[in-house]
Each structure stands twice: as C-alpha cells, then as structure tokens.
C-alpha cells in the first residue's frame, strides 16, 4: 500500500513508458514534511546520470511556511536518487545506446513511510503519436459510456 505524494501526469502524455523502476531519494527533513503536505510538482522533471549517480532534476518541492528562515533549501535543487550500482549501469547502457530518456513518474510513501521515487525509461512521443493517443482515449470513453447506457 503506497500513498502518492506527487505525480507527473504530463510524462504519460509526452513519453511512451517502456520500463519502471523504484528508487530511494535523499531529502532533507523539511522537504519530506513539505512532500507530505502536498507541496511537490514533478512537471518537466527528469532523471540524469551524473558521475555514476542518479539525480532527479527540475523537480519543485516548495518549502513550508514553518520552515526556519535560515534553512530554506533551493526548491529546484537536484536530488540524489538511490539505486543499486547494477541498476544504474543497466539504465546508463539503455539511455546511452538506445536514445531513451529517464523521467520521474511519482513520489510516494512505501509501507515503511519512506519516500520513494518511481522513475521510468521512456521514449519521447512525436506530435502524431500524441494526437493518436488522445483519439484512442476519447474512443474508449465513448465506448464505455455507450455500454453504460445499454446495460
């Protein structure tokens, strides 16, 4: 049972998700408190491998009003993701050879109340693919509503 703290809905629209992974995330105490209060935004966030380590970039975690004025971390600071070395090497190989991208899908609390990040290997969609996906989604909605009317 996990509780989503933040979701990146735009990632499902902009990318074709190929494979998902779970990673730990290194946060400060005030950032965890802000996440629990729902003050996170993963829109336009992505994951990069820098010097053999995974970092979540461009994720916005705004601080709470109760945070000490002397300790206000940068809201868009890069945050280190924690994974096993073999997994990082596997991701690096796929990103460098296949031209894939790593995006953050969600931040959530696991069963032990530890913040985890759900990241994905994804391939960018072009405009035609996005339009096709929207048409298919609308067709599915219409089909469901038609079934509800007659059942």
Swiss-Prot record:
Q: What range does the record give for the signal peptide?
A: none
Q: Taking the first listed entry, what is the main subcellular location of this protein, grouped into a coarse class?
A: cytoplasm
Key words of the record = Cytoplasm, RNA-binding
Q: Where in the cell is it found?
A: Cytoplasm
Pfam families in UniProt: SmpB
This entry carries the following GO cellular component terms, namely: cytosol
Biological source species: Campylobacter fetus subsp. fetus (strain 82-40)
Similarity-based family: Belongs to the SmpB family.
InterPro entries in the record: SmpB, SsrA-bd_prot, SsrA-bd_prot_CS
The UniProt entry, under Gene3D superfamilies, shows: 2.40.280.10
- Entry's Gene Ontology BP terms: trans-translation
Q: Name one GO molecular function term.
A: RNA binding
Primary role: Required for rescue of stalled ribosomes mediated by trans-translation. Binds to transfer-messenger RNA (tmRNA), required for stable association of tmRNA with ribosomes. tmRNA and SmpB together mimic tRNA shape, replacing the anticodon stem-loop with SmpB. tmRNA is encoded by the ssrA gene; the 2 termini fold to resemble tRNA(Ala) and it encodes a 'tag peptide', a short internal open reading frame. During trans-translation Ala-aminoacylated tmRNA acts like a tRNA, entering the A-site of stalled ribosomes, displacing the stalled mRNA.
PROSITE patterns recorded for this chain? SSRP
State the CDD domains in the record. Answer: SmpB (cd09294)
Which superkingdom does the taxonomy of this entry point to?
Bacteria
Q: Which HAMAP family match?
A: SmpB
Q: What is this protein called?
A: SsrA-binding protein
């Amino acid at each position: 049972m996990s509780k989503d703290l933040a979701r990146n809905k735009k990632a499902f629209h902009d990318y074709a998700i190929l494979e998902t992974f779970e990673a730990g995330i290194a946060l400060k105490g005030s950032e965890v408190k802000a996440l629990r209060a729902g003050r996170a935004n993963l829109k336009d966030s992505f994951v990069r491998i820098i010097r053999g380590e995974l970092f979540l970039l461009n994720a916005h975690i705004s601080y709470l009003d109760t945070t000490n004025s002397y300790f206000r971390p940068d809201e868009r600071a890069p945050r280190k993701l924690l994974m096993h070395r073999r997994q990082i090497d596997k991701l690096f190989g796929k990103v460098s050879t296949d031209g894939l991208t790593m995006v953050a899908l969600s931040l959530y609390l696991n069963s032990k109340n530890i913040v985890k990040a759900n990241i994905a290997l994804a391939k960018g969609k072009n405009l035609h693919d996005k339009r096709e996906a929207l048409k298919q989604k609308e067709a599915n909605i219409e089909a469901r509503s038609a079934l509800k009317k007659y059942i």
